[in-house]
Every structure is written in C-alpha cells, then in structure tokens.
A protein has these predicted regions:
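Long, low-complexity, intrinsically disordered polar/charged segments
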Residues: 1-5, 59-62
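N-terminal Rossmann NAD(P)H-binding glycine-rich loop of SDR-like oxidoreductase domains
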Residues: 3-23
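Conserved glycine-rich Rossmann-like NAD(P)H-binding loop of the short-chain dehydrogenase/reductase
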Residues: 25-36
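NAD(P)H-binding glycine-rich loop region in Rossmannoid oxidoreductase-like domains
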Residues: 36, 48-90
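Short, conserved active-site loop motifs that form the nucleotide-linked donor/cofactor pocket
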Residues: 41-42
Length: 97
C-alpha cells in the first residue's frame, strides 16, 4: 500500500512518516521543503495547489492520502488559511477522482 503524506517536512509530517516507515509502509512524501524528509521515503515533487490533470500520477498514484500540508501553519491568523481553503478542497477532490 502506497501512502502519500503532504506536509512531509513539517513537525507532524516528519513524525507520521517515520512511524509509517518503521511499520513497513511504502511512503511517498511531498512538501515544498525537502531537507527534513526521512531518506527512506520516496519524494514526489508536485505543486499540490496546481490544477494539473495528472497530479495524482505525479504524486505516485497513492492508495492512501494523509494531507498535512498547510501554508503558514503556526501563524493562526494568516489570511492564507482562508484563501487556500478552495485549493485544499480542489487538491483533495483531484486525489479522489
């Protein structure tokens, strides 16, 4: 089973990926930053907010998605949180099609 984790280099993402890998899962990691991603994971580079029709394939055709990506994560009052909601929805819908 292939599991895609977005926000892979974030605090939660790094811990989720490590646990999945320790349990023997095949992990595909996606993030704008790559420095802290566990080297055992396969890194997929793609803009999750793009309207690319082949985004699912570019992200490794995962069986499971754990979507943890969130721009400006700890800046709780950042306008980007509201502005990005439609993009998150579009990404999730694209991954289900």
């Amino acid at each position: 089973m292939k599991i895609l984790v977005t926000g892979a280099d974030g605090y939660i993402g790094r811990h989720v990926i490590a646990e999945l890998l320790d349990r023997g899962c095949e992990v595909i990691a996606s993030d704008l930053r790559k420095e802290g991603i566990d080297p055992r994971a396969r890194v997929a580079e793609a803009d999750i907010f793009s309207e690319d029709q082949e985004l699912y394939e570019k992200l490794g055709s995962p069986d499971v998605l754990i979507h943890l990506a969130w721009r400006n994560g700890f800046d709780h009052y950042n306008k980007s949180h509201v502005d990005d909601l439609p993009k998150h929805y579009r990404f999730l819908a694209a991954m289900m099609d």
